[in-house]
Amino acid sequence: LICYVSKDGETATCPPGQKCEKYAVSASHTGHWFYMYDCTSTCHIGPYNVCCSTDLCNR
């Protein structure tokens, strides 16, 4: 599921109650991060090292 953030900060593609968040994905522990957007429910799910914009990425 690909989400996008509109001008008012909402998203048209995420289910109700979920926010479209920027998060960082690292395929390995190299310190190289790729930034993407996805819905809150999938922010910590996947085969990669993922941190939400409201979580570890803010440190």
Swiss-Prot record:
Keywords, comma-separated and alphabetical: Acetylcholine receptor inhibiting toxin, Disulfide bond, Ion channel impairing toxin, Neurotoxin, Postsynaptic neurotoxin, Secreted, Toxin
GO cellular component: extracellular region
InterPro entries named in the record: Snake_toxin-like_sf
Tissue: Expressed by the venom gland.
Cysteines paired by S-S bonds: 3-20, 14-39, 43-51, 52-57
Residues in coiled coil: none
Gene3D superfamilies registered for this protein in UniProt: CD59 (2.10.60.10)
Location, primary (coarse class): secreted
Signal peptide: none
Location(s) in or outside the cell: Secreted
GO MF, one example: acetylcholine receptor inhibitor activity
Keyword Disulfide bond part of the UniProt annotation: yes
Function: Neurotoxin. Blocks muscular nicotinic acetylcholine receptors (nAChR).
Protein family: Belongs to the three-finger toxin family. Short-chain subfamily.
Record protein name field: Frontoxin II
Organism: Micrurus frontalis (Coral snake)
